[in-house]
Amino acid sequence: MSNSIQAIRNVYDIEKGARDNESPMSDEEIVKLLERTVSDKSLIPNYHRFEKGYAAEDLFMRIFSLLPWVKTVVPLGQEQFPEKSKEELQVPDYEITFEAGSESNTSCVLIEVKLVDGDKQTHELQKYKYDVLKKYSCQKNEPLLFGIFWRKQGVWTINSIESFAEKSSAYKISYE
């Protein structure tokens, strides 16, 4: 599945590049490219959901890289090997290096980007997904934060897990 997720990301990047060059791809062209490159065909109907998530990740990177105290925003990529490793350890979306008190003193944080779309006012993070992200964070000895884009409000929030309410199988956060 990991290779299929990376293939979907590659199609998104190609589609975005074509659009940026004022030569947008048709839906048929996108579907053909997905069919040729994505081995797990069950993921293809979910392309638009992936597309929204990738667009949120791109927006996060562009906005937060403009902050004067941010030194670097490094995408950590969608591809992870061995594929089964995501069951126990998952790499988040970004590592950010920022000034911590002075220009010469820097710190790093790991960011997992989430999109809350439509009229939703809450986001749920499954505990097992948090656990595998947290394990990576602990191994890197860097804090894990969540960059959440609340589309309806047009607002980003940066949250630690402590901002979420713990439920039986998930952590839940509300914009309200």
Enumerate the language-model features and the residues they cover.
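Acidic-basic catalytic patches of nuclease active cores, encompassing PD-(D/E)XK
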Residues: 1-12, 17-80, 139
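Short, flexible/disordered intra-domain loops and linkers
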Residues: 45-49, 84-85, 119-125
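Short, surface-exposed basic-aromatic patches at helix termini and helix-loop junctions that form
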Residues: 65-69, 99-101, 134-141, 162-166
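Conserved catalytic cores of phosphodiester-cleaving nucleases, focusing on short active-site segments
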Residues: 64, 93-98, 104-118
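Acidic carboxylate-rich catalytic motifs and surrounding loops in phosphoryl-/glycosyl-chemistry enzymes
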Residues: 76-78, 146-153
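Short, charged, amphipathic alpha-helix that recurs within catalytic cores of restriction-modification
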Residues: 118-149
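Domain-level recognition of nuclease-like catalytic cores that cleave nucleotide substrates
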Residues: 149-176
